[in-house]
């Protein structure tokens, strides 16, 4: 018997996803298709009768707008929302803004896969002369971060290391109080939560593709261990196509 339910949703397609660029901490907005994905995700939650008590998201507009769109669809826009940089996407460092297919053609698909999918290998750092350095590192939303906290690049391991303290200290107590929690975030910060919940190996989490805009439901026991595999809310074809699209992103165009 499930003691708790947790719902995760990865933001819908962003303008930079559409252009196949490494987004990281760049604040790309949702594309029109991404907005529709978020709407469909919200409608799936509405159709299944979901209600929530508190929501968590990043400080990046593609996740925030996904959350807004979902809350609008389920008519729960009044819910409290906690935003934190700790749920941000992985910081892609010097790769930020580069087209993934062009990067694969230049560095080889194997190297791009290492940067995108290896557990503890970070991409090259974002140097001060990077075109998006000031846009990200000098943004006032990060003014309270210490030098140690503000990354110039992150591996998946680094991303999980800054997301999990927030999970443990802020989200877990809410779940254990019986609050119904919705988290709208990014592929890599959500991977960290999934890895932690399911006890996945580093290899397994690298291969996990979370679809965009599709609600993912966990039923958890009193120790916050899943009692069954993650469930997707959406028809099977939608889920399969979304996961295949995510897996194809780092491949060079033929």
Swiss-Prot record:
The alphabetized UniProt keywords are: Acetylation, Glycolysis, Hydrolase, Isomerase, Phosphoprotein
Q: Where in the sequence is the signal peptide annotated?
A: none
Q: How is it modified after translation?
A: Acetylated at Lys-253, Lys-253 and Lys-254 under high glucose condition. Acetylation increases catalytic activity. Under glucose restriction SIRT1 levels dramatically increase and it deacetylates the enzyme.
Q: Where is this site: Transition state stabilizer?
A: 186
**Where, by residue number, does substrate bind?**
10-17, 23-24, 62, 89-92, 100, 116-117, 187-188
User: Any keyword Isomerase?
Assistant: yes
Q: Which SMART domains match?
A: PGAM (SM00855)
Modification N6-succinyllysine occurs at: 251
The record's Gene Ontology biological-process terms are: canonical glycolysis; gluconeogenesis
CC terms in the record's Gene Ontology section? cytosol
Tell me what reaction this enzyme catalyses: (2R)-2-phosphoglycerate = (2R)-3-phosphoglycerate; (2R)-3-phospho-glyceroyl phosphate = (2R)-2,3-bisphosphoglycerate + H(+)
Any idea of its EC number? 5.4.2.11, 5.4.2.4
According to the UniProt record, list the residues that bear Phosphoserine. 14, 23, 31, 118
Q: Phosphotyrosine modification sites?
A: 26
What Gene Ontology molecular function terms does this protein carry? bisphosphoglycerate mutase activity; hydrolase activity; phosphoglycerate mutase activity; protein kinase binding
Keyword Phosphoprotein annotated: yes
Instruction: Describe, as the record does, how this protein assembles with itself and its partners.
Output: Homodimer.
The function of this protein is: Catalyzes the interconversion of 2-phosphoglycerate and 3-phosphoglyceratea crucial step in glycolysis, by using 2,3-bisphosphoglycerate. Also catalyzes the interconversion of (2R)-2,3-bisphosphoglycerate and (2R)-3-phospho-glyceroyl phosphate.
Q: What is this protein called?
A: Phosphoglycerate mutase 1
Q: Which species is this UniProt entry from?
A: Bos taurus (Bovine)
